[in-house]
Every structure is written in C-alpha cells, then in structure tokens.
Design a protein with these regions (language model features):
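Residues forming the flavin
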Residues: 1-51, 57-532
Length: 532
C-alpha cells in the first residue's frame, strides 16, 4: 500500500472526486487503482472563506513499486497498518483478576480472554443497562446511588460522556482499540475521522458487546462486587477480598490488574493502608461552560456552518496564565449536556455528555485550571482526594442540596458578582440549577485564572466570553490526584509483585483511548510474566 497525505477536497466531495485527485497525484491510469482506504479526515477551517476537508489515504495499486519509483519524493510513501499485538501463551495457577470495568479494565480483561486465560472481571457497580437507570434517577429525582452512577459501573466514567476517542499518545495499540470498538458496534468512521467519538447512546451497546465476548471466551464478569482488600504473602499477591451481596468473599490469584478509575477513593484508602505505594500528582479543576451550539459552529466554520457535510463544531483552547498554571478546555461536548457526576453523598461535581448525533441546542466543555500538590494543603498521598471532596461539598451546599448545581453567567463571573437570573443560554444540567456566585465554592486562584482564560479565549474563539454563557460548578474529576508508581519494565506496582496498576485511576491515562491502551499493555505484561 501507499500512503498519501494532505489531500484537500471540497466539503461536497464524492468518491469519484477523490479517485480523480489520487490518479492525478500518482500519475497513473484508473486501472492501476485497486482500493482506497481513508486513514484520516479532518476539517480545515482556518480560512472561513475556504472551509474544506483534508484527507490522508492508503491506496493499493497493481504496480506500486513502478508507480512509486517515478513519483517525486514526498508524494506517496509505503504504508502498512499497525498489527494487533501477538498474545503469548501463558499459564496461571489461578485466573487473573481485573478490578474495574472501565476502558482500562475492559480492554485488559478482553486481552486476557483472547489469550485463553479466562480472567475474572469484577466491577463494584452495575451492568450498563441497570446503570443507565441509576443515572436517570439522579437526573430526574436527585437521588444518588453511591455504587451505580456516572463514575461507577460497567463502562466507567467514559460510558456517560461524549465517547471521545482522541488521544495525545502515539501507541500502535490505538488502532487495535478503535478496531475493537468497531467490531463491537461503533461506527466505522472512528477509524479515520480526525476527532472520533462514539456518543453515550452507542457506547453502551459497545461495552455490553465487549462483556459478552469476554464471557464467550470463558471469562467471568461479576457486578456489584467491590474490592475490599489484598491478600499478600510478603510482597507477593495471593488473592483479594471482595464484598458481594453483603458478604465478604476471597478470590485466589497471583495476578491483579487494578483499573479502579479516578473516583474510587474508598478503595484507594484501603490500598494505602495495606502498603501500596502512592504519590500525589497534579490535576485540574474548574467548571463546565455552556454556549449555544449555533454560536460555536458559526465561529468555527463561518458562513458555511450549516453545510450538511459539517457536524456540530468543537473547539480546544488553552492559554498561559500569569501564575504559570494555565487554563484550558477539556472534553468538549458538541450538542451535548452537562450531567451530574457525583459518586459520594453530599458532594457535587459535573461532567459533559453527548449522544452520537450531537444534536442538542448547547455546546459544553470543561474549563479547567491546573492545580499542584502544594495546593492540597498536606503532603499525605491522598490529600488531593480530601481537597477535591471539600470543594465538592462546598458546591453541594451552594446548590442548596438535592444535587442541584450552582451556575453563574460569564458576565457576572468577570465582574465579580453573583448571578441572580439566567439569560439567553438555558442550562442542560439536571436535576436543576441555582444561580449563584462560584467564588463561594472555588479557590480564589481558580476563579482568577478562569476569568483570565475566558477573556483570552474569546480572542481565539469569537463569542467564548458571551455574557450569558453559563458556568456550572464544579468540575473536579478531570483526572486522578494520585499516582500508583509501577516498574517500567514489568508494570507491577512497587513493592507488590503481581499487582498491576492501570488506567486513569492509577495515574497512567487521561481519556478512553489512553486508558484502553494502558489496559492492553498491563494485560500483555501479565501474560509475558506468566509465559510458558
């Protein structure tokens, strides 16, 4: 195959248009062209008078070597798709256990199951079908189930999000992750669009299908099963204890992949007491900002924003702040909604979610400020959790209880005044909102950096500082404030042989794809350690 990049095509291009361009670039007749595979499709909207697509493709020709030899350097290059990892044959005395059914845990368990070692996947929450009912109960009635919510349950926090599949990592395993999603029902275009996403509605079916494959391959999936302790002999794993149906049970194993996510604070406390090494890490905190989606799309695409080939526009913004922390947007959800993301009673935090169609009236994004371990007020490894919790409790009180969220208009934040009434932008957060002053629940340095960032971002994206744009508090769970150090070669936790910290909760990922990649890597490490 040959790869061609930077192919500019109009918004209404057809396969015939693309083929004509390829034949011209390759200087070959139509009969040479056997197949064309899209590798990447992105929108170039830098010039609002000339919004167009930019493509990368892989082509198969009858005489590739002959065609390539007569082309100028840089027109095309040999290409092969990254191969899925080879799974070593391994033997385990007891089935390996994966703790947590988020992206890292699901992909770890699936990798182990495909290797024929019949893993046990445990999840403290419920299957995605039942979990959806718990989330609806929160949205409609303001009732929290501490074990089944936006954070806990099959699919992890990513199941109730935009289903965004972008990542800053360059791992060859990314293709494996995306292809696995497609094989389990995700749209095929995630393999090539520049900013792939699935949407919460489709992602639930994908997650359910992955679970079914794990079971079909001989693995077990146990829900409502919470890790309560490690069983060790010296510094080696011998098993775990779990709470299931109100009873404590033991599971014998010398291999545990720990993929508990960034919100299992109680589990982290248990592990710390048992001697698992942990350290503080920086993360970020802030709010969700909501604008009319039409405003964002017009700002990004100009007059052609209603073109049928263009989807709801997104954005990714970042500014340097005077204190050096930085303010940036994260997990932007076009046509989405702000959702309740609490997992503990009397604490409030928010997240963003979109369906696949991204057809909602509002756009939302996290607007975050970098926080450092010295902000935690204590050098205890879990001090970041305590600080997070205190801010979530302050937001809960400011919202008046019942998981109603405090909101503030952008104009009011910029002028240091409380919001008393809402403007043209109507909130999407359920079970409800309360106009407020976010200074009552966020530290001063975060407020000041948010103000600075909003003003600067308005210069990058016209309308970002719209007076009626809404800020919903608080976004505290963008990533984990804790890292579990692990050996770079074996990927095992320091001082605990057989324990593999994985994914976002362990501090080694930041999003669905990077967590999934890390889950695969830890599973491969365990397989190699037990290779025959």
């Amino acid at each position: 195959m040959l790869r061609l990049d930077s192919l500019s095509l109009p918004l209404d291009f057809t396969p015939e248009t693309l083929n004509t361009l390829l034949l011209r670039k390759l200087k070959c007749p139509p009969e040479q062209l056997k197949s064309v595979v899209l590798l990447k499709k992105a929108v170039d909207a830098r010039d609002k008078a000339d919004v167009h697509f930019v493509l990368s493709v892989a082509v198969t020709l009858k005489d590739e070597a002959k065609v390539l030899a007569r082309l100028k350097p840089g027109v095309a290059a040999p290409f092969t798709f990254p191969k899925a990892p080879t799974l070593p044959k391994a033997r385990f005395e007891h089935p390996p256990v994966v703790v947590g059914a988020g992206p890292a845990g699901l992909f770890a368990a699936l990798t182990l199951a495909r290797a024929g070692v019949q893993p046990i996947l445990i999840e403290r929450g419920k299957p995605v079908e039942e979990r959806t009912k718990s989330v609806q109960m929160m949205q409609e009635q303001g009732i929290l189930d501490p074990e089944s919510n936006v954070q806990f349950g099959e699919g992890g926090a990513g199941a109730f999000s935009d289903g965004k599949l972008t990542t800053g990592t360059k791992s060859p395993l990314i293709r494996t992750v995306l292809q696995t999603f497609v094989d389990h029902g995700a749209p095929e275009d995630i393999l090539y669009i520049a900013k792939p996403h699935v949407g919460t509605d489709l992602l639930k079916g994908v997650v359910r299908s992955m679970r079914q494959e794990i079971i079909q391959l001989g693995g077990q999936v146990r829900f409502d099963t919470r890790l309560t302790g490690l069983m060790m002999r010296g510094e080696s794993m011998e098993g775990i204890t779990v709470l299931c149906g109100g009873e404590t049970q033991e599971i014998r194993t010398d291999t545990v992949i720990l993929a508990i996510g960034h919100s299992a604070r109680d589990t982290m406390q248990t592990l710390f007491r048992q001697g698992v090494r942990m350290e503080q890490k920086p993360f970020a905190m802030g709010v969700r900002i909501e604008h009319p989606q039409a405003l964002i799309s017009q700002s990004q695409y100009g007059k052609c924003w209603t073109h049928p080939a263009l989807k709801a526009a997104d954005y990714k913004l970042a500014v340097h702040t005077p204190d050096g922390r930085g303010t940036y947007t994260f997990c932007m959800c076009p046509g989405g909604e702000v959702i309740a993301a609490a997992s503990q009673p009397d604490g409030l935090c928010v997240n963003g979610m979109s369906y696949h169609a991204r057809a909602g009236e509002n756009a939302n994004s996290a607007l975050l400020v970098g926080v450092r371990p010295e902000d935690f007020g204590d050098d205890h490894p879990l001090a970041g959790f305590v600080w997070q919790r205190s801010i979530e409790q302050a937001a809960f009180r400011l919202g008046g209880g019942g998981y109603k969220a405090p909101v503030q208009r952008v104009e009011d934040l910029l002028h240091d005044r409380a919001t008393t009434r809402l403007g043209d932008v109507q909130p999407t957060y359920r079970p409800g909102v309360v106009p407020a002053d976010l200074r009552a629940c966020l530290p001063d340095f975060i407020i000041e950096d948010l103000k600075f960032g909003i003003r600067r971002m308005d210069g990058q994206l016209h309308g970002f500082a719209h007076p009626d744009a809404l800020l919903t508090g608080v976004e505290t769970r963008s990533s984990s404030p804790v890292r579990l150090p692990r050996n770079r070669e074996t990927l095992m936790a320091e001082r605990v042989d057989g324990l593999y910290p994985a994914g976002e909760g362990a501090g080694f990922a930041g999003g669905i794809v990077s967590a999934a990649v890390d889950g695969i890597q830890t599973a491969l490490a365990a397989l190699h350690h037990h290779a025959e």
